[in-house]
Structures are given as C-alpha cells and as structure tokens.
C-alpha cells in the first residue's frame, strides 16, 4: 500500500485531539491497514498532529490501561514511521466517567492528552447534570483540565444552556 507524502499547502497547524485510530483496541480502527489509511487521509486533509484516544471504558469492555496502550502506541508509531506518513502522533485516552469512586480507582490507568494536563472525558448517554459537574470537579481536583467528549449527545447540555458556561467558570 502506498501512502501520501505529498507537499500539501499548510495553513495554521491542525491538531486532532480525539481519534480512535489506534488499531484493535476499541470501537475504532479494526486493523493496522485501516489505521494507516485513516492517518493518510487526515494528513491529506491538513492534519499535522493527531492524538490517539482509545476508550478507557471498563463497563463497555474497553480495558485499555496506560501501560497497555503505551506499548501498543509505540508499536504503531514505529509502523507509521516505517511507511512514511509524515504526521506526528501523540497518545491520550477517552475516559468513561461513571462515578467518583470509579474515577479514583482507575486514575492510574488514565492517559492525558499528549502528556498534558488535559483529560478527555466521556459519559453514558443518559448522564445527568450532577454527574457531569461531579466529573469536572473530580478531574480538576487531580490537577487536570477536563475536555468533555461529544457534549452535544447529552440531554443535560441540550436542556440547560447554563451548564457549559458553569463548567467553564469552574
């Protein structure tokens, strides 16, 4: 398979901070080839850096603790280098927040976005406002900054227009 190494006109730096490209670890890419095709297309579309954010969601069977995904990430990054896709890869995770207890229990397994203080957090679709606020507080207490994945999916944001501004103020 041949991958793009075209000189694409670049404008501002584009970094994708949420992707399911790390192969065979969650509901994203189903193979290494699929992942390489996804990265190649992202590069062609102007993405220069991408954070691979596999699900860390034990309730859904996505058992992807830090050590496991770090090893898989290194293997995959070497493959990407070998085929010559000129895109910079970083690691993170998308953590499914269900309760403060679960968050505390699994915090050691969490990988922040590109080794920064930003943490990508997802919720069950029927999450209520109190759990969202608890999650934000819990993440902040750990010295991290939460980034809520797919806020448009949650009724709490749709029905309470003050929720997002309230979170930003925290």
Q: Which ranges hold each PLM region?
A:
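An N-terminally biased module of ancient metal coordination in phosphate/nucleic-acid-related enzymes
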Residues: 3-85, 165
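Extended substrate/RNA-proximal surfaces in nucleic-acid metabolism proteins
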Residues: 62-170
């Amino acid at each position: 398979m041949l991958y793009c190494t075209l000189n694409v006109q670049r404008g501002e730096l584009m970094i994708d901070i949420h992707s399911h490209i790390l192969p065979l670890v969650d509901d994203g890419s189903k193979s290494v080839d699929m992942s390489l095709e996804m990265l190649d297309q992202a590069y062609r579309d102007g993405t220069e850096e991408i954070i691979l954010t596999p699900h860390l969601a034990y309730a859904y069977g996505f058992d992807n603790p830090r050590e496991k995904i770090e090893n898989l990430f290194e293997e995959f990054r070497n493959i990407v280098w070998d085929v010559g896709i000129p895109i910079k890869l970083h690691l993170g995770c998308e953590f499914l927040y269900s309760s403060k207890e679960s968050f505390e229990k699994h915090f050691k397994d969490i990988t922040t976005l590109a080794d920064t203080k930003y943490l990508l957090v997802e919720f069950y679709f029927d999450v209520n406002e109190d759990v969202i606020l608890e999650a934000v507080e819990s993440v902040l207490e750990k010295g991290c900054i939460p980034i809520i994945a797919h806020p448009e999916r949650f009724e709490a944001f749709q029905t309470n227009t003050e929720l997002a501004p309230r979170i930003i103020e925290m």
